[in-house]
From Swiss-Prot:
Membrane spanning stretches: 566-586
Origin species: Arabidopsis thaliana
Gene3D superfamilies, sorted: Phosphorylase Kinase, domain 1, Ribonuclease Inhibitor, Transferase(Phosphotransferase) domain 1
Pfam families per the UniProt record, alphabetical: LRR_1 (PF00560), LRR_8 (PF13855), LRRNT_2 (PF08263), Pkinase (PF00069)
Residue intervals on the Extracellular side: 25-565
Range of residues in the leader sequence: 1-24
Top-level taxonomy: Eukaryota, Viridiplantae, Streptophyta, Embryophyta, Tracheophyta
The protein's name: Probable LRR receptor-like serine/threonine-protein kinase At5g37450
Length: 959
């Protein structure tokens, strides 16, 4: 009966709507109305942004975010744009969006939408902007998107899109912006994309791309920015053709598993930004001159040799040269020579951990706005005082972040006058009359791929550009940028205030001007210098204009006769539709009704995570309860200080490990989400990946990838049938060291693990090691200005036997504390002994054996045959790591390189191949691969010292 009443109600409402149209001059096409109603049903609107979508006619009633235009051919109004940016919407994209045949802009950016992208969007052949960034969309990109022949901007970054790139996207011949970064897209970039001749910006960083780096991309004549960081290409070289892309402004291939030499880039005459760091590049830095526009050269974490070219000193705009962690030597050129640095300019030269043995006197006296870092070079050996000591000092290890600004501009005597800041007013600096107080419109925008490392020299010219006649066409004093901040990528967030023009009568924009400014930014009309790259709107802060109703102009141009005809047709259409609905209900009511259970998760939805969450899924309690058989004892696979760990089976066959916090380990919700945010940014093949979380029903759980071969502690246990070969032990040691190196040098902020031990080194199905149990409590401390301190003074939760002995004296933790713990693990790998057992100390036992010339007597006999040279060098490295004096211990990068050298001594036929999990006789959750003389092998080359994955997510973006 209730359902019958609903149908009758609908009929009455429809009839009323149709009759009310007799007084109207405008009406939305019924197909568009129906489509938007379906869209609304698929969405959840917790903040009621779409409350006016309950009105009858979308265009006539000015539905929020809906912009319409008349179509003279049928006399109806049609939906032209759908702007639903940053409205905290959840739910899914309705397939019925494909019915909005006149749609040109579809903008759902920075919401929390889930589900897949409907293939029906391929029907929107008039679409020019497809903007879906910053949601939680999953699945593959539909092939049907290749039918969007008029598309200019394809922006689906910061989602969870997987699968391969469809070749059909090569049909988007008008496309200018291809933004698919920060997803989980796999496979190779289709070479067919080289036919996208109008693409300016190709951003695919932080995905899971493999295969070759296509040389065909160099055939894109309009290409300005190519950014593919964080890919895992198959050890390919950088194509030489990339050095001849005529308009290339930025080339960013950081951490892409690239090999070979650096190509000649001298033909890239407008190149501003080069980042090919964290690869396996070899040879020398090319001597050919870079573009005079170059601001940033990042070559760090490679295998480069030779010297720094002398012509680097002739680069007038250079802001940052990073060549640390290579094998460079020779004379260091004075980069700032023949250059006058302005007060707002800054130059950073990071030369750490190379082979430089001498420096010139000029280099020892850099200007105040030049930073030189020499730590870890031979020239720094035994330096205790003087200017060289300053360049070699520990302070040069600080993480140097690009400049961030939050300025307070002096207003002089204006403070004596009244300007109600609390009411979103502010002084307009530089206005024709002093102390002009006005209400600005706030625009939060982000430069997606800027081609510089320091914004300050560009700030004034950027504001002038935005104000210029080709853009907003306002006075320069009407624009202010008093806050900007760098985010991972790197990307640049800024808050721009736009003030009304000076007037004695008014200090606010009228609604028409507010609408013009909003339209200007929302339709990507801003035209600026190529070095700034593409931009996106994060949010629009209306401030004092919250009560302003922004009316979108709609001129139907319909005659009364046409309107009446449309109304009569619409009434007939809706009456037929209503009759069909009644017939359907009567038939349906005769069927047996099925009761449906109320979903508890709808009553207790997942709390909204922080704005900058990335690549992790929020699970509800029911999902994890079902996956773990109600957290049964049979599902439990471990227990730690955080709580119990369960093996879970999620729909689709995904096997996970669920860490369930015990009562004493629960955090505040803010702290819990902060930890998730940090962990979600950490991506390295030797770190256990966080897949999701749950914060429901008083529970806090973390969902990780499942490691079927258990831990290193399991593999070293005497309970297991088959021992580990030396080659496999070295491989595990090397992978573990690489994971720790990433935490120390590439995590943002850097992390000290504090509890490295065999049980926290897990083994996947191919026996690849993954470091586990690192979290927010282990962050390297930052001072008030965001600068890294060289130690942490929190209470240690480490395990006895692995804790740095220096800590008990200084109560300080440093990266060298992790080095000590890892050294103990190395000794366990070599000897099979526990760190402390029956009064015996592993460090003391090993040192005594080595001093007596009996090193081999403590080697684990289950290792089988092995190379004594490899064992000796491995043991020497382990002992160096376990020195009581932290200064005597090597840095993690040195450890990785030495292990690579030792592993290189292992004959190819003895190296372990990547095998499937081998079940142990002792446990169903652990197993290991064993090198056998009769086995079929492939060389283990999955890791390099420089395969580091940088963080990818914005730290301010609304997520």
């Amino acid at each position: 009966m209730k359902e019958m009443m609903g149908v009758v109600g609908i009929i009455l409402v429809v009839s009323s709507c149709c009759l009310s149209l007799l007084d109207a001059q405008e009406i939305t096409h019924p197909t568009d109305v129906s489509a938007l109603q379906y869209v609304h049903r698929k969405l959840k609107d917790p903040l009621n942004h779409l409350q006016d979508w309950k009105k009858t006619d979308p265009c006539a009633s000015n539905w929020t975010g809906v912009i319409c235009i008349p179509d003279p051919s049928d006399g109806f109004l049609h939906v032209k744009e759908l702007r639903l940016l940053n409205m905290n919407l959840t739910g899914q994209l309705a397939p019925e969006l494909g019915l909005l045949s006149n749609l040109t802009i579809l903008n759902f950016m920075w919401n929390d939408l889930t589900g897949q992208i409907p293939p029906e969007l391929g029907n929107l052949t008039h679409l020019i902007f497809l903007l879906l960034s910053g949601n939680q969309l999953t699945g593959s990109l539909p092939q049907e998107l290749g039918s969007l022949s008029n598309l200019l901007i394809l922006q689906i970054d910061y989602n969870e899109i997987s699968g391969k790139l469809p070749t059909s996207l090569a049909n988007l011949k008008k496309l200018k912006h291809f933004h698919m970064n920060n997803n989980s897209i796999t496979g190779q970039i289709p070479p067919e994309y080289s036919t996208l001749t109008n693409v300016l910006h190709f951003l695919m960083d932080n995905n899971k791309l493999t295969g070759n780096l296509p040389p065909e991309l160099a055939q894109m004549p309009s290409l300005r920015i190519l950014q593919l960081d964080g890919s895992n290409f198959d050890g390919t070289e950088i194509p030489s053709s990339y050095g001849s892309i005529p308009n290339l402004v930025k080339l960013s291939l950081r951490n892409c598993n690239l090999e070979g030499p650096i190509p000649d880039l001298s033909k890239s005459l407008v190149l501003y930004y080069l980042d090919i760091s964290s690869n396996k590049l070899t040879g020398e830095i090319p001597k050919n001159k870079f573009s005079a526009n170059i601001t940033t050269i990042n070559l760090y974490n490679n295998l480069l040799s030779g010297s720094i070219p002398s012509n680097f000193s002739g680069l007038p705009r250079l802001q940052r040269l990073q060549v640390q962690n290579n094998n460079l030597s020779g004379e260091i050129p004075v980069i700032w020579e023949n250059r006058i640095l302005k007060a707002e300019e800054k130059l950073i030269l990071d030369l750490r951990n190379n082979m430089f043995s001498n420096v010139s006197s000029v280099l020892l006296n850099p200007p105040s706005n030049v930073t030189v870092k020499l730590y870890g070079n031979p020239v720094c050996a035994n330096v205790n005082a003087g200017k060289l000591a300053d360049l070699c000092g520990i302070s040069t290890l600080e993480v140097e972040s690009p400049a961030t600004s939050s300025e307070t501009i002096s207003t002089g005597d204006c403070k004596r006058q009244s300007c109600p800041v609390s009411e979103n007013y502010d002084y307009v600096i530089g206005s024709p009359v002093a102390c002009f107080c006005a209400a600005p419109l706030g625009i939060d925008l982000r430069l997606r791929s800027p081609s510089f490392s320091d914004f300050r020299p560009y700030k004034v010219s950027y504001m002038l550009d935005v104000a210029s006649p080709k853009n907003l066409g306002i006075n320069p004093y009407q624009i202010s940028i008093d806050t900007f901040a760098w985010q991972s990528g790197p990307r640049l967030f800024m808050n721009m205030k736009i003030f009304p023009e000076y007037s004695e009568l008014n200090s606010k924009f009228n609604s028409t001007e507010v609408q013009r400014i909003v339209d200007f930014f929302a339709t990507f009309t801003l035209n600026t210098d190529d070095s700034l790259g593409p931009y996106e709107i994060i949010s629009i802060n209306t401030g004092a204009y919250k009560d302003v109703t922004i009316i979108f102009p709609k001129k139907s141009g319909m005659s009364i006769g046409v309107s009446v005809g449309i109304i009569i047709g619409a009434i007939a259409f809706f009456l037929v539709l209503s009759s069909l609905a009644l017939v359907f209900f009567i038939k349906r009511s005769k069927r047996k009704r099925k009761t449906r259970e109320v979903d508890m998760e709808q009553e207790h939805p997942l709390p909204k995570p922080p704005m900058n969450m990335e690549s992790v899924k929020g699970y509800n309690f029911t999902e994890l309860d079902s996956a773990t058989s109600s957290f049964s004892d049979l599902s439990q696979i471990g227990r730690g200080g955080y709580g119990k760990v369960y093996k879970g089976h999620l729909p689709g066959g995904l096997v996970v490990a669920v860490k369930r916090a015990e009562q004493g380990s629960l955090q505040g919700q803010k702290e819990f989400f902060t930890e998730i945010e940090l962990l979600s940014r950490l991506h390295h093949r030797n770190l256990v990946s966080l897949l999701g979380y749950c914060d429901q029903k008083g529970e806090q759980m973390l969902v990780y990838e499942y490691m079927p071969n258990g831990s290193l502690q399991d593999a070293l246990s005497a309970r297991f049938r088959q021992p580990l070969s030396l080659a496999l032990r070295l491989r595990i040691a090397l992978g573990s060291a690489r994971g720790i190196l990433y935490l120390h040098t590439e995590a943002d902020p850097p992390i000290i693990h504090r509890d490295i031990k065999p049980s926290n080194i897990l083994l996947d199905s191919k026996m690849n090691p993954k470091v586990a149990d690192f979290g927010i409590s282990k962050l390297i401390a930052l001072d008030g200005g965001g600068v890294q301190r060289d130690h942490v003074t929190t209470i240690v939760k480490g395990t006895p036997g692995y804790v740095d002995p220096e800590y008990y004296l200084s109560h300080r933790l440093t990266e060298k504390s992790d080095v000590y713990s890892l050294g103990i693990v190395f000794l366990e790998i070599l000897t099979g002994m526990r760190p402390i057992s029956h009064g015996r100390n592993i460090v003391r036992e090993v040192n005594e054996a080595c001093d007596a010339g009996m090193m081999m007597s403590v080697i684990d006999r289950s290792m089988g045959q092995y190379s004594e040279e490899c064992v000796k060098r491995f043991m020497e490295l382990a002992i160096r790591c376990c020195q009581d004096n932290p200064e005597a211990r090597p840095w993690m990068l040195e450890i990785v390189r030495e292990l690579e050298n030792i592993y290189g001594l292992i004959p190819k036929e003895e190296k372990p191949y990547s095998s499937p999990s081998v079940q142990s006789s002792a446990s169903g959750m652990s197993g290991f691969a064993v090198a056998s003389p009769r086995s079929s092998y492939t060389t283990f080359s999955e890791f390099t010292a420089n395969q580091l994955v940088s963080g990818v997510i914005p730290s301010i973006a609304p997520r």
